[in-house]
């Protein structure tokens, strides 16, 4: 039997797998157990009471976290004319049309978010097989296909997170870094949960928020007592 690492032993000793922790206690645990030599991200998994096999129960969208994600986000924008100037002024690193598409086709993808104005989708549509598998394809539901590209760039830079249910009906995303203040992580999580509640499909029955767990990049999941997130519910 393989020996447990020091970190794995610590997690086993500290984390009760059947317990739902007060959000403040959960964050304190993550901070205590974050022993990696880099600043770990704090990730969240939200189990939703939806049937992901039904298209009308897929939950997808985006929300801006009040304290951002702690990541520097590079943004590429497909647009032209005055919108191109506005996107550049808003802070987009890459702006263009066919020439930007050529870069993507050549494998030059030094960006984290792709935004497009509606008139640029004829160009972006050719890149579906490249951008789609990487989760970068612009979509109106996440605010990344929009006539107001400047606002979308600002949102991306401000810490907007995009979310989508996976095949098991679970949302996975990031709510910050482990060196954030506890209240910042709590408020970011509340903002995400609030957005998910608003996005509840009309056809979803029963309990919608089934389980909320937070973890660090290298750590175990800690279940959160939803009653301590009452502000968002």
Curated annotation (Swiss-Prot):
UniProt entry keywords in alphabetical sequence: Repressor, Ribonucleoprotein, Ribosomal protein, RNA-binding, rRNA-binding, Translation regulation, tRNA-binding
Signal peptide positions (record): none
Pfam families: Ribosomal_L1 (PF00687)
Entries under InterPro entries matching the protein: Ribosom_uL1_bac-type, Ribosomal_uL1, Ribosomal_uL1-like, Ribosomal_uL1/biogenesis, Ribosomal_uL1_3-a/b-sand, Ribosomal_uL1_CS
Gene3D superfamilies: 3.30.190.20, 3.40.50.790
GO CC terms of this entry: cytosolic large ribosomal subunit
Complex and partners: Part of the 50S ribosomal subunit.
Family, per entry: Belongs to the universal ribosomal protein uL1 family.
Chain's role: Binds directly to 23S rRNA. The L1 stalk is quite mobile in the ribosome, and is involved in E site tRNA release.
PANTHER family: 54S RIBOSOMAL PROTEIN L1, MITOCHONDRIAL (PTHR36427), LARGE RIBOSOMAL SUBUNIT PROTEIN UL1M (PTHR36427:SF3)
Name of the molecule in the record: Large ribosomal subunit protein uL1
Species this chain originates from: Shewanella woodyi (strain ATCC 51908 / MS32)
């Amino acid at each position: 039997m393989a020996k447990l690492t020091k970190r794995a032993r610590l997690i086993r000793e500290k984390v009760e797998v059947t317990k739902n922790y007060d959000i403040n206690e959960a964050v304190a645990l993550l901070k205590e157990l974050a022993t990696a030599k880099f600043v770990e991200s704090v990730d969240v998994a939200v189990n939703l009471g939806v049937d992901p096999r039904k298209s009308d129960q897929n939950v997808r969208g985006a929300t801006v976290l009040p304290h951002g994600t702690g990541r520097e986000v590079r943004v590429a924008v497909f647009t032209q004319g005055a919108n191109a100037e506005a996107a550049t002024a808003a802070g987009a690193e890459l702006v263009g049309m066919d020439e930007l598409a050529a870069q993507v086709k050549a494998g030059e993808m030094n960006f984290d978010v792709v935004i497009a104005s509606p008139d640029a989708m004829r160009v972006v549509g050719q890149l579906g097989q490249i951008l789609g598998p990487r989760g970068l394809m612009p979509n109106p539901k996440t605010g990344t296909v929009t006539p107001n590209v400047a606002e979308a760039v600002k949102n991306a830079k401000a810490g907007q997170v995009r979310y989508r249910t996976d095949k098991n009906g679970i949302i996975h995303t990031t709510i910050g870094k482990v060196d954030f203040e506890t209240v910042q992580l709590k408020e970011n999580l509340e903002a995400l949960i609030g957005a998910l509640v608003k996005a509840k499909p009309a056809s979803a029955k029963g309990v919608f928020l089934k389980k909320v767990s937070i973890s660090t990049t290298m750590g175990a999941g800690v279940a959160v007592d939803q009653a301590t997130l009452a502000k968002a519910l």
